[in-house]
Amino acid sequence: MKPIEGYNKLRGGYYTPEKIAEFIATWAIRTKNDEILEPSCGDGSFISAIADRLHKMGASDQSIKHNVTGVELDKVEASKASQYGPNVVQSDFFTYYQKCIDGEKEFDVVVGNPPFI
C-alpha cells in the first residue's frame, strides 16, 4: 500500500511508472560494472529496473548489491526498495551525499525520476 497522496506531496514523493523506469535504466546503464546511485528511490521502481538491467547484462546478485546504492528518507519505502537486492540507505540524500564527497563512494551513473534528477 502506497502512502496517502498528501503525505507524498509533503515529502516530494512521486512513483514512476515501471515502463519509464525500465527505459531510463536501459538508456543510462552502459556496463554491468557501473557504480549506480538512485538518490530518491522510494519503494524501488528504479531500483528494480536497475537490477533487471544489470542482470540482463550478466551481473551477479553480489555485484548488484555492491555497485548499486539507493537512498530513501522514508523507512517504510526504503525497506520496500531493499527487496530488489541493491544496497538501500535509509537517510536524507544530502547527509548521504556529504559522506560521498568526503571520499566514501563515487558513482558512474545517477538514475531517478525525470525531470527531478
What is the predicted role of each segment?
Residues 1-117:
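SAM-dependent methyltransferase catalytic region
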